[in-house]
């Protein structure tokens, strides 16, 4: 995998993700994530009662973005992704809690998004460079 993508995903912590709702429409949500570099997954916490988790019965396919929050055009960087969301393994849970140790007290369910397609854009390389 492109080392720039790995470095960027390790540095960031907030993803915008889109699932498919009961009417087949896109449903967006934001989540803090930990990056599992070995398995190339984003790990996030969410409860079974959340709308986006309920929508996984329709399709486990998701898409989303991770972007640097900046107003300076020359510093814009981001990842666009497509993947599959499923319940995280015990090892993945540990990776999440290593990054967000304070969340362990709430004992949330952890989910894994395997990154199947990824595109990285960085204006630091020149405007609109992929």
Q: Positions of the model-derived regions?
A:
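Extreme N-terminal tail/first-helix region
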Residues: 1-16
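Charged, gly/pro-rich active-site loop segments
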Residues: 73-130
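Short, flexible, solvent-exposed loop/turn segments with mixed acidic/basic and small polar residues
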Residues: 31-34, 71-75
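Short beta-strand segments
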Residues: 12-48, 63-66
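Short acidic (Asp/Glu) patches
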Residues: 46-50, 63-68, 91-102
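Active-site-adjacent structural patch at catalytic or cofactor/ligand-binding sites
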Residues: 46-48, 58-69, 77-86
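Short, surface-exposed beta-strand-loop junctions and turns on beta-sheet-rich folds
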Residues: 48-52, 70-71, 127-128
